[in-house]
Amino acid sequence: MEVKTIMLLFQILAISTLKQGSAHVPDGYVEENVALRGRATQSAQLRGEHAALAHASNAIDGNRDSNYHHGSCTHTEGANPWWRVDLLQVYTIASVTITNRGDCCGERISGARILIGNSLENNGINNPQCSVIGSLATGETRTFHCPQPMIGRYVTVYLPKIESLQLCEVEVNALLPVN
């Protein structure tokens, strides 16, 4: 436990030297997609004919293919949907990269919030906000930088409206010390 605490303190020290809004990776650190190591879940999975293609884990499979029917995207149902990855440990997160669905419905993601923190209260929706997806073109991949690096275990994408949430890839870019 001591080693983890010391590493976390070094990460906090490193990020405290960053300017707010900076995308700079501090010396001695690298950015790595830690979502690949995590476990994904979502508010409700699409039902019906294409339900087998809609699993939450599809958004962290390392595949940016934006065609839903190729089996690498997730799809929710219901009002105010959310998708979440449990990173299984706490990381210092600089940004989140999202790949939007490309074969249709790209406008649905508009207004989604990217939330990062250590709480599962309200399914992670009460965690601090990293960014808001104002709009994202159909099939587009874009990186959303947090105003400053954030510390958290859970990354939630929450869509506060009556619409389905469809994500083809979610990459959580954490700052890791170079070994």
Curated annotation (Swiss-Prot):
Acts as a defensive agent. Recognizes blood group fucosylated oligosaccharides including A, B, H and Lewis B-type antigens. Does not recognize Lewis A antigen and has low affinity for monovalent haptens. A motif (Cell attachment site) lies at residues 101-103. Ca(2+) binds at N58, D61, N63, S72, C168, E169. Its main location: secreted. It is found in: Secreted. Gene3D superfamilies: Galactose-binding domain-like (2.60.120.260). InterPro entries: BG_Antigen-Binding_Lectin (IPR051941), FTP1 (IPR006585), Galactose-bd-like_sf (IPR008979). Keywords: Calcium, Disulfide bond, Lectin, Metal-binding, Secreted, Signal. The lineage of its organism: Eukaryota, Metazoa, Chordata, Craniata, Vertebrata. Gill mucous cells. Alpha-L-fucose binds at H75, R101, R108. Homotrimer. It holds the Pfam family F5_F8_type_C_2. Disulfide bonds join C73-C168, C104-C105, C130-C146. One of its GO terms (cellular component) is extracellular space. This is Fucolectin-4. The keyword Secreted applies.
